[in-house]
Amino acid sequence: MKTIIIDNLEWQEENDGNRRSLRDSIIYATTLGDGWRLPTIEELISIVDYNTYSPACKIDFCCPSHYWSSSLSASNSSLVWVINFCYGDVNFNYKDEHYYARCVRPIADVKNFKRR
């Protein structure tokens, strides 16, 4: 898997091409190994470039589509924040919708990772 380091996080460089429910996206992240998880909505927003669109992203690996965050809505725990990298818009949707997952892990986990 190709990755890129941005602001103390290691990001998947590309999604795997599969849209999943939130539950299945969380499971997918754990299959990647040590420390991998879904990003928070704040982490996803940090890579949005609002001066461009399709994709609205500061880096080249963003597909212009919806991606899951790990951030639940404060008013309704059935809803999760998602981001659309086509325009950088942020909203929430139900957990059973199917979106892409772009996983991250902290740099500390990368430094502590031992190849087997």
Predicted features by range, described:
Residues 14, 70-71, 86, 104-106:
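Structured loops at beta-to-helix junctions and adjacent beta-edge loops in soluble globular domains
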Residues 1-36, 79-82, 100-104, 111-116:
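Extracellular adhesion/carbohydrate-recognition regions
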Residues 21-35, 41-93:
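An exposed tryptophan-centered "aromatic clamp" motif
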Residues 65, 98-100:
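Extracellular structured ligand-interaction cores
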